[in-house]
């Protein structure tokens, strides 16, 4: 959750001082952003691509960036042509954490009454699948942001960590909860209590990421996966995502009940009828998203 460039290896030679985000401003739909880059990708422009773009600050997650990210997510969520979203950063860093200067003078009262970081998890309320394409550092808030996504693809040199303990605090945007669910108690506890990072290879072995790709092809691979998802029925994809996510919130019995209800619900859709008819007739399904 915290900005962690000061915690990167001494081999980096110099420690970059945290860069303060200017006061954020709201953007009208379609306007240019200051901290992110957005575009549509894929043959049918069915993939929304969001790139964090504060390279000098290693994509430190300031308030303005999060506000822009949430707006971009909502824009793609409401776009009927977009079926999935890819979130990425740069080759050096996905995101090295939150902006320290933005939080170092906060008090308990500020955090509690202002619900500090409460808008960070907006991405978890997006119904369309979000794939994190992680190159370089995903530390603190950067790691938490990646874990809020539905799928994580990692570049070969990616590193994941929750080093907040080294700053005298703990993760505050879901790090202790999502990391533990993803990799298990022992590894999560070790990472959170020591601040140690894990490599992309270790992250895959632990179940944090699903696939690893060369740095230069990572984003394209994520886009291809998103495009494959976007070819399916959007309403059915949303149901499937809801059901899988429920596995982390419910007991097995409760989860199975929800899955059954959602399964039954697919029979109220035209896309379920089209999908099964296409299978029987040995043709490609033509989903209409209803």
Swiss-Prot record:
Q: Which source organism does the UniProt entry give?
A: Rattus norvegicus
Residue numbers bearing the N6-acetyllysine modification: 101, 115, 211
Q: Which residues bind substrate?
A: 98-101, 141
Query: Quick one: effect of changing residue 144 to D?
Result: Reduces activity 50-fold
Q: Where would you find this protein in the cell?
A: Mitochondrion matrix
Gene encoding this polypeptide? Answer: Echs1
What Gene Ontology terms describe what this protein does at the molecular function level? 3-hydroxypropionyl-CoA dehydratase activity; crotonyl-CoA hydratase activity; delta(3)-delta(2)-enoyl-CoA isomerase activity; enoyl-CoA hydratase activity
Its family remark reads: Belongs to the enoyl-CoA hydratase/isomerase family.
**GO biological process per UniProt:** fatty acid beta-oxidation
Reaction equations catalysed: a (3S)-3-hydroxyacyl-CoA = a (2E)-enoyl-CoA + H2O; a (3E)-enoyl-CoA = a 4-saturated (2E)-enoyl-CoA; (3E)-hexenoyl-CoA = (2E)-hexenoyl-CoA; (3S)-3-hydroxybutanoyl-CoA = (2E)-butenoyl-CoA + H2O
The identity of this protein, by name, is Enoyl-CoA hydratase, mitochondrial
Q: Its quaternary structure?
A: Homohexamer; dimer of trimers.
Its taxonomic placement starts with: Eukaryota, Metazoa, Chordata, Craniata, Vertebrata
Listed pathway(s): Lipid metabolism; fatty acid beta-oxidation
Function recorded in the entry: Converts unsaturated trans-2-enoyl-CoA species ((2E)-enoyl-CoA) to the corresponding 3(S)-3-hydroxyacyl-CoA species through addition of a water molecule to the double bond. Catalyzes the hydration of medium- and short-chained fatty enoyl-CoA thioesters from 4 carbons long (C4) up to C16. Has high substrate specificity for crotonyl-CoA ((2E)-butenoyl-CoA) and moderate specificity for acryloyl-CoA, 3-methylcrotonyl-CoA (3-methyl-(2E)-butenoyl-CoA) and methacrylyl-CoA ((2E)-2-methylpropenoyl-CoA). Can bind tiglyl-CoA (2-methylcrotonoyl-CoA), but hydrates only a small amount of this substrate.
Q: Which superkingdom?
A: Eukaryota
The protein's site described by Important for catalytic activity is found at 164
Q: Which residues carry this modification: N6-succinyllysine?
A: 101, 115, 204
Tell me a GO cellular component.
Answer: mitochondrial matrix
Q: Which tissues is it found in, per the record?
A: Detected in liver (at protein level).
PROSITE patterns, A to Z: ENOYL_COA_HYDRATASE
FT transit peptide: 1-29
Variant or mutagenesis effect after changing residue 164 to Q: Reduces activity 330000-fold
The record's keywords, sorted A to Z, are:
Acetylation, Fatty acid metabolism, Isomerase, Lipid metabolism, Lyase, Mitochondrion, Transit peptide
In short, the EC number is 4.2.1.17, 5.3.3.8
InterPro entries per the record?
ClpP/crotonase-like_dom_sf, Enoyl-CoA_hyd/isom_CS, Enoyl-CoA_hydra/iso, Enoyl-CoA_hydra_C
């Amino acid at each position: 959750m915290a900005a962690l460039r000061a915690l990167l290896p001494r081999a980096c030679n110099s420690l970059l001082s945290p860069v303060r985000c200017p006061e954020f401003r709201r953007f009208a739909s379609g306007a240019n952003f200051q901290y992110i880059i957005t575009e549509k990708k894929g043959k049918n422009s069915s993939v929304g691509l969001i790139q964090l773009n504060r390279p000098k600050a290693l994509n430190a997650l300031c308030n303005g960036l999060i506000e822009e990210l949430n707006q971009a997510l909502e824009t793609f969520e409401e776009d009927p042509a977009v079926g999935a979203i890819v979130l990425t950063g740069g080759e050096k860093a996905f995101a090295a954490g939150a902006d320290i200067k933005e939080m170092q003078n906060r008090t308990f009262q500020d955090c509690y009454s202002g619900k500090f970081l409460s808008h960070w998890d907006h991405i978890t309320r997006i119904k369309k699948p979000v794939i994190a394409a992680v190159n370089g550092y995903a530390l603190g808030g950067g790691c938490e942001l990646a874990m809020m996504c539905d799928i994580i693809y990692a570049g070969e040199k990616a590193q994941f960590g929750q080093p907040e303990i080294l700053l005298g605090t703990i993760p505050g945007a879901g790090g202790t909860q999502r990391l533990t669910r993803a990799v298990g108690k022992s590894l999560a506890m070790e990472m959170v209590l020591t601040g140690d990072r894990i490599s992309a290879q270790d992250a895959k072995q632990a179940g944090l990421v699903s696939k690893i790709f060369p740095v230069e092809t990572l984003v394209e691979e994520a886009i291809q996966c998103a495009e494959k998802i976007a070819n399916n029925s959007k309403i059915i994809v949303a149901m499937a995502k809801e059901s899988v996510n429920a596995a982390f919130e419910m007991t097995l019995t409760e989860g199975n009940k929800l899955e059954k209800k959602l399964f039954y619900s697919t029979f109220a859709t035209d896309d379920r009828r089209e999908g099964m008819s296409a299978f029987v007739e040995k043709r490609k399904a033509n989903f209409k998203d209803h």
